[in-house]
Amino acid sequence: MASKLSIDHEAIPVTALNCSFRKKLGLFLNPTNTVAADWRTVAELMDFTYLEIKNFEKRDCPFEKVLTDWETRPDATVANLLSILEKAERKDVISELKEILDDDCRKYMERQQRKPLQVPVVDSCGPRTQEREGITLYDDPQGLTPETFDAFICYCQSDIQFVHEMIKQLEHTEYNLKLCVFDRDVLPGTCVWTIASELIEKRCKRMVVVISDDYLDSDACDFQTKFALSLCPGARTKRLIPVVYKSMKRPFPSILRFLTICDYSKPCTQVWFWTRLAKALSLP
């Protein structure tokens, strides 16, 4: 059945490409090549900066990281990946891996065509398992009226003081917003990854990402950010809002570079900071 499907590469995200394709693509592009373009040329064509590329160089398999970061962008389609490889004059790679690539694309299309199994008594918009019932401080233990929030706050522990200031400015003022702060609102004893995905997707209208140097080293923040981006490719719903509250020594995360940020690190913009952030979180 899969072989009969015609492929529109423009409509298929790069996330559809499986591990075997990624590994083989890396085998072509990772080695430094004095004759053909390597991963650095491809990264430049993907619009990564010089500093980002220098950071990628520190990895054993740099192209895997390049592809992982690029695939969160709104233009990360299979068609654009093929176009970039052509611009890099690596048609040899396309020719060698085209069969594997198309096979992954067909499998993705098959999965998209399958109708999800729906049980009549289950509301797909609400919690679906016991693990997702009674997860926050003011949840209904039976899961009938789950607690909802205006925004999920993605932060690392070293930035908790700024989160306290955010609570003060957005919850205890005329803005009267309701924030989901993991350390304050989530009950202990639950799976961190499952609960975070439930809150971000089902319970919170938006997500605020507190960006700092320490954020870049946080596995939890990395998961939460990429999960939120996967829910709104291209930021069409203004779902994710990056916030910078102090100057950074390390490069701003490339996967968030296409989003408008709220910057508290510059004294000249602080006067507008809370009003802008509150307005963004108050949108329908």
UniProtKB/Swiss-Prot annotation:
Record keywords, A-Z: Cytoplasm, Immunity, Inflammatory response, Innate immunity
Location in or out of the cell: Cytoplasm
InterPro entries: DEATH-like_dom_sf (IPR011029), Death_dom (IPR000488), MyD88_Death (IPR034249), Myelin_different_resp_MyD88 (IPR017281), TIR_dom (IPR000157), Toll_tir_struct_dom_sf (IPR035897)
Signal peptide (from-to): none
Region described as Intermediate domain: spans on this chain: 102-143
One Gene Ontology term from the biological process aspect of the record: regulation of hematopoietic progenitor cell differentiation
TIR domain segment(s): 147-281
Protein's UniProt name: Myeloid differentiation primary response protein MyD88
Organism from which the protein derives: Danio rerio
